[in-house]
């Protein structure tokens, strides 16, 4: 995928999420039950943790270093998500929202630094992709997986809850 298409996909999902968050408002972001017992705030903290790890991983690769996140790169999905939840459960919704969008801004800026060739040539990026993803794949797929595709996984739960709660959404 070309850089421009990757950025467009990321910005499109970001806009959808921003619309949902505006409809929810800070006062309702702590209400549990959006997805299991998780609140909107919890889901955002979860997304931000993965985006943050992606940002650090990309920054390290630009500096010629391999980065493996010792929490988010462990194979047990439930364990790593539990750690993310415990780490963030006492943070305010305002703090999480602010951090989330700041992290997305950083991610977009980092994506701009990569060429289309770097994003699509699995050979040239294998040195830092394989240690984190355990397989050779195009860099854009790694970025998509932990950013806009991850938002796409969680947006339906938020939208469903909003539809149930707000007749004007």
For each of these PLM feature ranges, what is it?
Residues 3, 86-90, 136-140:
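A short, mixed-charge helix-start or loop-turn motif at secondary-structure junctions
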Residues 79-121:
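Acidic/histidine-rich alpha-helical segments that form the ligand environment
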Residues 5, 31, 84, 95, ...:
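Conserved short-loop catalytic and cofactor-binding motifs
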Residues 1-16:
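Extreme N-terminal tail/first-helix region
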Residues 7-10, 93-100, 144-147:
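Hydrophobic packing residues in well-ordered alpha-helices of helical domains and bundles
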Residues 30-79, 122-169:
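Short, contiguous alpha-helical
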Residues 14-25, 51-55, 59, 101-115, ...:
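Structural signal for well-ordered, non-membrane alpha-helices
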């Amino acid at each position: 995928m070309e850089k421009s298409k990757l950025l467009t996909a990321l910005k499109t999902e970001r806009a959808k999420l921003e619309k949902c968050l505006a409809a929810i408002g800070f006062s309702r972001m702590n209400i549990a039950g959006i997805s299991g017992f998780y609140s909107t705030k919890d889901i955002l903290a979860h997304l931000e943790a993965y985006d943050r790890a992606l940002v650090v991983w990309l920054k390290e690769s630009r500096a010629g270093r391999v980065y493996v996140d010792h929490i988010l790169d462990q194979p047990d999905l439930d364990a790593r998500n539990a750690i993310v939840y415990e780490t963030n459960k006492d943070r305010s919704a305002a703090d999480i929202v602010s951090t989330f969008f700041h992290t997305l801004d950083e991610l977009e800026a980092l994506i701009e630094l990569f060429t289309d060739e770097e994003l699509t040539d699995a050979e040239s990026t294998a040195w830092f992709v394989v240690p984190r993803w355990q397989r050779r794949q195009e860099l854009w797929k790694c970025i998509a997986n932990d950013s806009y595709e991850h938002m796409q996984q969680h947006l339906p739960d938020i939208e469903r809850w909003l539809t149930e709660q707000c007749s004007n959404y």
